[in-house]
Structures are given as structure tokens and as C-alpha cells.
Design a protein with these regions (language model features):
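Short, well-ordered beta-strand elements
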Residues: 31-41, 85, 95-97, 117-121, ...
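Alpha-helical secondary-structure segments
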Residues: 36, 113-122, 154-160, 164, ...
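N-terminal lobe/hinge region of extracytoplasmic solute-binding protein
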Residues: 38-91, 122, 204-210
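Gly/Pro-rich hinge or "lid" segments in bacterial periplasmic/extracellular proteins
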Residues: 73, 175-233, 352-353, 357
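Aromatic- and charge-enriched surface segment that lines or borders ligand/interaction sites
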Residues: 85-131, 152, 158-160, 250-253, ...
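Surface-exposed binding/hinge segments that line
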Residues: 99, 118, 136-189
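Ligand-site clamp/hinge motif
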Residues: 199, 226-272, 397-399
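Detector for C-terminal structural segments
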Residues: 217, 313-342, 378-388, 409-533
Length: 533
């Protein structure tokens, strides 16, 4: 191991001091050039971007590695070059050619070239871990990735897809964490057999991003140091992520000045720190939707009038105000806020009379009995109980069947439920990530290879599947957005999904802290613009 510089030693020392301070102790605020955040680090099992498939680890990758492009959060139809300076698409729509910025370097000091970019994408596919599935979305497989992802010269790389896709979709895939650029020379020096350096990278880092890894202590902390060779200026010299599982402990650390930000406060804790003036809170909608899935194998739930009636039998505003509060907001369409083509329409509210009229039209004027599989955890249990009471107003008797996440999900995936309450989270910020889940079912048979959400609810939708495929291939971003908006309008009126809420990330920061960018997915959380007064 190389000797640590004095700055890195200082960072580690500061982190250890912070960890040792009792929660009740009053102390000076964190150093002006250090940002300390209380968060949850229990998802970390590896540091390899080709293996990571969890939320907070994706955030780590987003700040230690670069990729070809990144989506513009202000306009999801646009992309900003990361290591790519410019790019073109061939006339047949299959090949994307990227020109790289000259003079880029990895944290190791090795130059970043097109060979590294091509090898990084090939590596992720050939490793065949969870993230490879994202790259498979544009047709890259173990059989073709070496031929389809090529270095043309030191500053030019090309990626060829298996069919014509919307350019926004391809760029979203190539701008996601599985396509992170890794240091080929460094990883090959640590390769064991044919593991592409995976064993070494599980606990080390080989990136070129704004911050480099100093130390990861599993279940405790991650310490990052500013990469002074980065192409953009960074105000924070050090970033320290602390694992603090209890929300109350996060609040005390924040109030005492031991951390600059807390990511996992409860609604009551958030209200408390704002009232005391010791913190400010920012809210960022997340690409996670909480919904009811209605299994159309149940003949009653298969009736369109029943599906619509249930949408009028949820007290969305009441549940939001009394159960989930500021951690979720009402959202009823399948594309989350911030996605290309999002339709922010919430036409449904609790209307028992309208629901009863629809049930009568469906031939069940007195209601019916049904089961709901519920994960025995907050907020699922509390929301399910509220929905149970709502449905009872129209004579619908709901039997709640509690279970852990593994049990309820297994039953859902086997299509053995009546109603399932759960969440869907997008892997990347492209509308296809959700359209494929809610509006695509090419084979409704039990032996289907495509078991997405529509399949799980036995919803046979050949026409909507064609529309999803057409939207995926639409080359013009504006027309693509229109296609998704039309699909959302159709599904609001006719679908076995009662989409209720969108998750909201609430971040509490100390006064004087600014610039923490929290996108709709963890892969789009950035420390680049962090500042402290």
C-alpha cells in the first residue's frame, strides 16, 4: 500500500475523531473544507461499479467514477459530456461514436483513453454481475460486446447497439453507473485469473471522478479525498459518509454540528430541526413509486369498472397527510417526476359515490372480498390498513396477509396474489425503465421469459406493448415524450395499477451548506458543487 499523504492522514484522523464523539457532546462544527454526512451504509458489500446494484453504493460510484455522459437533471431530453466531449449517431441509428476530452487522468495518474472506456463497458458485461442487465438493455451481450464496443483511436470510442433505439435511451444507459470508466492498466495489474480485477476492486477504487477513495470501513464510514487532477474545481477537500442507522442519532449529530447533513431523518425529526433553526430541509422527488397491483387472474379485479372504482376508493391526500407525511407525495402516473415525458396528473381522489356506481356497473353493487399481500414494515402496513378502511366504505372486504419482503415478493412474482402493495424503483432515469415495467408484456403465459409488473398482474396488453416498443425506438425526444404522455393518460383510465405515491428524499443540512445535488436516483447524487460558508 502506498503511503498516505498528510492530507489523507488528516482526513482519516478527523473521521475517527468524529466517530468517537458521544452523541450528546457539544462541539465545534466540522472543518470548512470537510463535508460530513450521516447516512446508511449497510448496503455496501463491494466497491466495484461492475458489481454494485444497491442505492447508496451507486451514489459512491457517481462521485468517484466518470462515465461517457450524464443526463441533464434540468432537462432530461439533454445530456452533458462527462469524459466525452462530443458524440454522433450513425445514419442507421445503430452506432454511437464518442470523442473524448484530451488530457484526462485516473486517480492513479494513468491517462484515461478510449481503450479504458471500451474495456470498462466490455468488463461490466463480461463480469455478468447484476449491473450487466442495464447494458444488456441496448443489446450488449457476452457474445458481442467486444465486437460492438471498440476503441477507434486514443480519443475515440464507438458503441453499436443490436437494433435502433431512441438516442435518449442509449445515452441514459451509457450514462448510468454500470458504464463507469475504470482504470484498465491498474485493474489488470491486480487481476486474479479472469476476474478483471474484481477481487481487488471490491475494496479499492480505480476511477477518475471528482473524489477518490481514502478508506472504506464496512458498517462504519467511507472517506473520500478531492482529486486535484479533476477537470472541474471542487470546494470540498474531503467527504466523510458515516453510517448512522438510527434517525434520532442522525438528528442529534446534526444539531450538535458533528455532521453537516443527515439523509434519513423521520418526518418528526425533520420538523424538529427546521423548527429549531439548526438545519434546513430540501425535498427531492425520487424515481420510486408506491402502488397497488391488481391480479387480473381474479375475475372481479379483471373488470375495468372495478379497477377504476378502486382508484376512486383511496384517500390519497389523507394517507399522505397522516401516514407518509413528507416522505412521499401523491403521484398517480407510471413515470416519476423529472423523467422525459412525465405526466404530472393526479385526477383521482376519495369519491365513494362514484366508486359505488362503477361497482354496480361491474355487477358487484355490494362489494366483494379480496386479499392483499403486505410487507410487514413501514409504511406498507400503515398504508394497507388505511386502504382497507377506504375500500370498506364501498363494501369491499380486504383481508391483509402480512409477510416479510421476500415472502410477499415471491408470491407476487408467482402471480398468486389478489392485490399486492409495493414499490417500483427505476434503475436509470429513462422512461423505458418504468414503461417496460408497467406497460409491456410480450408474453402473458406462465412460461414467459419477461416477467415484469404487467405480467405479474396477468395483464395481457398486445397493443400497449407495441406502443412501448415504438416509444423505445422513437428518435425524436419531443415525440418520444408525447408517446409516453399518451400511454400514461390511457393507463390512468384503464389499468390494474393503482399508483398512489412517489417517494421524496428529504435531506437536512446545517445552515451555510449548499450544493448537494440529489437527483431522482442515487446514481444522480453529486458532491461536485458542495460548499460551506
Amino acid at each position: 500500500m502506498k503511503l498516505l499523504t498528510s492530507r489523507l492522514v488528516a482526513a482519516l484522523a478527523a473521521a475517527s475523531v468524529l466517530a468517537a464523539v458521544p452523541l450528546s457532546a457539544a462541539r465545534a462544527e466540522t472543518p470548512k473544507d470537510m463535508f460530513v454526512m450521516a447516512t446508511l451504509l449497510d448496503e455496501f458489500t463491494t466497491l466495484d461499479p461492475g458489481e454494485i446494484y444497491e442505492l447508496v453504493p451507486e451514489e459512491y460510484v457517481a462521485n468517484t467514477y466518470d462515465r461517457l455522459v450524464r443526463v441533464d437533471l434540468r432537462d432530461p431530453s439533454k445530456f452533458n459530456g462527462d469524459v466525452a466531449q462530443s458524440w454522433t449517431v450513425s445514419t442507421d441509428g445503430l452506432t454511437y461514436t464518442f470523442k473524448l476530452r484530451p488530457g484526462l487522468k485516473f486517480h492513479s495518474g494513468n491517462p484515461l483513453t478510449a481503450d479504458d472506456v471500451a474495456w470498462s463497458i466490455q468488463r461490466a458485461v463480461l463480469l455478468d454481475k447484476g449491473p450487466a442487465a442495464v447494458l444488456t438493455g441496448i443489446g450488449l451481450t457476452k457474445a458481442n460486446v467486444v465486437a460492438n464496443v471498440k476503441r477507434l483511436d486514443d480519443l475515440t470510442v464507438s458503441v453499436t447497439t443490436d437494433q435502433k433505439y431512441a438516442p435518449t435511451f442509449v445515452l441514459n444507459v451509457l450514462g448510468s453507473w454500470p458504464a463507469s470508466v475504470v482504470d484498465k492498466k491498474l485493474l489488470l495489474s491486480h487481476q486474479q485469473g479472469n476476474d478483471f480485477g474484481n477481487a481487488w476492486l471490491k475494496t479499492n477504487e480505480a476511477g477518475s471522478g471528482g473524489y477518490k477513495l481514502v478508506k472504506w470501513t464496512a458498517g462504519d464510514s467511507v472517506v473520500l479525498q478531492r482529486f486535484d487532477g479533476y477537470r472541474l474545481p471542487l470546494a470540498m477537500k474531503r467527504i466523510v459518509l458515516r453510517h448512522v442507522p438510527e434517525a434520532a442519532s442522525q438528528r442529534l449529530l446534526l444539531e450538535n454540528g458533528d455532521v453537516d447533513a443527515a439523509r434519513d431523518l423521520s418526518p418528526d425529526d425533520l420538523a424538529s430541526v427546521v423548527k429549531s433553526g439548526k438545519a434546513k430541509v430540501s425535498a427531492s422527488p425520487q424515481a420510486t413509486l408506491l402502488y397497488l397491483g391488481l391480479n387480473t387472474k381474479n375475475p372481479t379485479l379483471a373488470k375495468p369498472e372495478v379497477q377504476e372504482a378502486l382508484k376512486w376508493l383511496v384517500d390519497y391526500a389523507g394517507i399522505q397527510a397522516n401516514v407518509v407525511k413528507t416522505t412521499y407525495k401523491v403521484h398517480q402516473t407510471f413515470l416519476p417526476e423529472g423523467f422525459l415525458g412525465t405526466l404530472n396528473a393526479n385526477p383521482y381522489k376519495l369519491d365513494v359515490a362514484k366508486a359505488k356506481a362503477l361497482l354496480a356497473k361491474a355487477g358487484v353493487p355490494n362489494g366483494f372480498s379480496v386479499t392483499m399481500d403486505v410487507r410487514n414494515d413501514y409504511p406498507y402496513t400503515e398504508i394497507a390498513q388505511a386502504v382497507q378502511a377506504n375500500f370498506a366504505q364501498a363494501g369491499i372486504k380486504v383481508q391483509l396477509i402480512p409477510g416479510d419482503n421476500k415472502q410477499t415478493l415471491a408470491k407476487y412474482r408467482a402471480r398468486q396474489h389478489d392485490i399486492y402493495i409495493g414499490e417500483w424503483s427505476a434503475d436509470y432515469i429513462d422512461p423505458h425503465s418504468n414503461a417496460q415495467g408497467f406497460a409491456w408484456n410480450p408474453d402473458n403465459s406462465d412460461k414467459s421469459s419477461y416477467k415484469m409488473l404487467a405480467w405479474r398482474n396477468s395483464w395481457d396488453i398486445p397493443q400497449l406493448t407495441k406502443e412501448t416498443d415504438a416509444a423505445l425506438a422513437e428518435p425524436t425526444a419531443a415525440k418520444r415524450a408525447q408517446r409516453y404522455q399518451a400511454m400514461q393518460k390511457d393507463m390512468l383510465a384503464h389499468s390494474p395499477f393503482v399508483i398512489m405515491f412517489e417517494k421524496v428524499a428529504q435531506v437536512a443540512t446545517r445552515p451555510g451548506v449548499s450544493g448537494l445535488e440529489v437527483g431522482p436516483i442515487n446514481d444522480l447524487v453529486s458532491y461536485r458543487n458542495l460548499k460551506k460558508q
